[in-house]
């Protein structure tokens, strides 16, 4: 399970160093093989260990290519999916097209989200956190049953 937000740097080749606390887990779970794709709703990237991505691919394969909305989701997620292999120094090369999509510069936030990571431009991440907190404080919407059951 991945959790927490960590500031990492992209080098001049577009590689990021995976924090050491995740490297052993990723090497054991996926031999360092990862898949990176776009997020459909946020200006960030999604980074999955290969076994987790294969579950997503199975779900995508069950969508109908005859349904326009389902086909769009397939096209966006699969069409942007890029395999990344963690090297011996624990670095992942993020494809240039993906870096451009999320406007990733030198400072990148690696955000653990259970079975995957999100990759955010640092400033965009902090703005998103502020926006999320503001939305939670000002929302008039009733909580879903699942959120009502969540006790922190």
From Swiss-Prot:
Residue stretches in coiled coil: none
GO cellular component, one term: nucleoid
Highest taxon above the source species: Bacteria
Keywords noted in UniProt: Cytoplasm, DNA-binding, Repeat, Repressor, Transcription, Transcription regulation
Residue span(s) of domain SpoVT-AbrB: 5-52, 81-124
GO biological process, one term: negative regulation of DNA-templated transcription initiation
Localization annotation: Cytoplasm, Nucleoid
Keyword Transcription regulation on entry: yes
MF annotations from Gene Ontology: DNA-binding transcription factor activity; transcription cis-regulatory region binding
Keyword Cytoplasm: yes
Family affiliation: Belongs to the MraZ family.
Quaternary structure annotation from Swiss-Prot or TrEMBL: Forms oligomers.
UniProt-recorded name of the protein: Transcriptional regulator MraZ
Species in which this protein is naturally found: Pectobacterium carotovorum subsp. carotovorum (strain PC1)
């Amino acid at each position: 399970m991945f959790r927490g937000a960590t500031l990492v740097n992209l080098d001049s080749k577009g590689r990021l160093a995976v924090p050491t606390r995740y490297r052993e887990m990723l090497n054991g779970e996926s031999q360092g093989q990862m898949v990176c794709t776009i997020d459909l709703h946020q200006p960030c990237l999604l980074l999955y260990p290969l076994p987790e991505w294969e579950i997503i691919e199975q779900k995508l394969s069950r969508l109908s290519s005859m349904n326009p909305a389902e086909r769009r989701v397939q096209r966006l997620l699969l069409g942007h999916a890029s395999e990344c292999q963690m090297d011996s120094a624990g670095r992942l090369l993020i494809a240039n097209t993906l870096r451009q999509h999320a406007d990733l510069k030198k400072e990148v936030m690696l955000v653990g989200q259970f079975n995957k990571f999100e990759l955010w431009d640092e400033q965009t991440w902090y703005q998103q956190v502020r926006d999320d907190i503001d939305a939670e404080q000002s929302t008039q919407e009733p909580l879903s049953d699942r959120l009502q059951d969540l006790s922190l």
